C-alpha cells in the first residue's frame, strides 16, 4: 500500500524543518496514523549535514513533549519523486526548492507549498528563522509550526480518508 509522503524544508535543517517534522509525527502518533505516512525534513543548504537539530529548538520542543530526533540532510532531486508534499518554511526556501526542481529537470509530482499558507491566523508571510535570536524565538516559531502543521493535516486528511476507503492506503 502507498503512503502519503511529506518533506519539511528550511535553510539548514536544524531548527524549523526538523521541528515541523517532529510536530507532524507527534500529531500522527496521537491519531494512530503513522503507518499511512512517510515524514522527513531537509535543508536547502549543506552546512549542517549529519548534525542534530539546534539544542535550543530541541529543548523548546521537549517542553511540549515533542522529540526532535532527525539528523540534518540536504534536499536533492530524488525528493521530488519520493514526496507528495514538500513544504517550505519561507519564501527563500520556496524559491530554492523551485530552482532545484528546475535545474534538475525533475518530472516529480511533488506539490511544493509554503507551510505558512496552512496557518489558521496568517499574520506573517513566513515561518521566521529563530537561529540568530534568543530562546523566546524558538517558542514563538513552535507556536507557528504547530498551528501550520495542524492546518496542513486538516487540508490533507480528506485525501487520506478517501485513499483508505478506496484501498489505496491502509490504516
What are these regions (language model features)?
Residues 85, 91-171:
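Phosphate-binding/catalytic loops
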Residues 1-83, 157-163, 168-171:
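Conserved active-site segments centered on acidic
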Residues 17, 90-91:
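Helix N-cap/beta->alpha junction signal
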Amino acid at each position: 500500500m502507498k503512503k502519503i509522503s511529506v518533506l519539511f524544508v528550511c535553510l539548514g535543517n536544524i531548527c524549523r524543518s526538523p521541528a515541523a517534522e517532529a510536530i507532524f509525527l507527534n500529531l500522527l502518533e496521537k491519531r494512530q496514523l503513522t503507518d499511512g505516512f512517510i515524514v522527513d525534513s531537509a535543508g536547502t543548504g549543506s552546512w549542517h549535514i549529519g548534525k542534530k537539530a539546534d539544542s535550543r529548538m530541541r529543548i523548546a520542543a521537549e517542553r511540549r513533549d515533542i522529540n526532535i530526533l532527525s539528523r540534518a540532510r540536504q534536499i536533492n532531486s530524488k525528493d521530488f519523486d519520493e514526496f507528495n508534499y514538500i513544504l517550505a518554511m519561507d519564501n527563500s526556501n520556496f524559491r530554492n526548492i523551485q530552482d532545484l526542481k528546475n535545474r534538475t529537470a525533475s518530472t516529480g509530482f511533488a506539490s511544493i507549498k509554503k507551510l505558512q499558507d496552512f496557518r489558521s491566523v496568517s499574520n506573517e508571510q513566513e515561518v521566521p528563522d529563530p537561529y540568530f535570536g534568543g530562546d523566546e524565538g524558538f517558542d514563538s516559531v513552535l507556536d507557528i509550526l504547530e498551528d501550520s502543521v495542524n492546518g496542513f493535516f486538516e487540508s490533507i486528511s480528506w485525501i487520506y480518508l478517501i485513499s483508505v476507503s478506496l484501498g489505496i492506503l491502509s490504516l
